[in-house]
Amino acid sequence: MNNLSRKDLALVSLMLFSLFFGAGNLIFPPFLGQSAGTSTWVTMIGFLITSVGFPILGVVAVAKSSGLHNLASRVHPLFATVFTILIYLSIGPGLGIPRAGSLPFEMAVRPFMPEGLVSHGLALFIYTFIFFSVAYWLCLSPSKLVDRMGKILTPTLLILISAIFIASIFKPLGSYGEVTGNYIHSPFVSGFLDGYMTMDTIAALNFGIVISLVIKSKGIEGEKAIVKNSVKAGIFAGGLLIIIYSMLAHLGATSGGRFGATENGAQTLANVMLYIFGDGGAVLLAVIFTLACLTTCVGLITSCSQYFVTLSSKVSYKAWVRILALSSMILANM
């Protein structure tokens, strides 16, 4: 078989979208829109090149090379080993995975916790324990990831974000705010740099192997067929990212006209949610942050475990999942 069915292509594409769409992707566009104001759409062109275009190219490059190690081997075998290990460690257990567990708590749960209910440390521990337990369970069966993420987690996330945008149409925030900072003189370049800061270009080097393995599990064989289907999934996922990023940037731009400048994108989103949904907006925001970070966390743990198991057959895939989930939970609480 050379082509994924429409259903499988949609599921793989949704899974790829959810792998990329983490907490940073949720807060960058609103903050960009608020800061860029009337120059939002010029800024977004630059942002989309590095936050969508580059990552999709990365997925295709890794798929075509049958893994990051093979891609880097074109330089030198030793370089490939060192480079690949550093990439997986830095974007995985060294930063990305622990941050995926702690960031939604700090951004969307802690600010709305009743004072004196429980200590910050205990609340964070409880949250991250539940978070990484769910992530661990999801990662145990890589073959089921596409169904669990593509059928449940990602559609839920998309529905919730779309609901915010639709609600903002019926309860508009206002007009676009004024252009501020670097966006005044160089909106395109500023957006270009902001898009790179999502770190998805680097993450794509990790996720490429996950997508290739998922496509193979659907009965696709041969390098050309895998690359072809990776491109299709990338285009579909990229289109979804563009739509969602544009929605979030619009919300941020209109919030600037009503609330003025905020310190970060999380605060911008919090203002929008409270204005549109009232107190219930805090709960909705916490759910969105958690889902966005959970899907990215699952992708990182899976990709890192898949690679590390190739370095030593003495440690199984499930053991690596256990090690990464536990160590990341500990780091998230430090």
What is each of the regions a protein language model found here?
Residues 32, 102-122, 216, 297-324:
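Helix-loop-helix connectors at the membrane interface of multi-pass transporters/channels
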Residues 62-71, 131-153, 217-220, 330-334:
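Membrane-water interface regions at transmembrane-helix termini and the short interhelical loops
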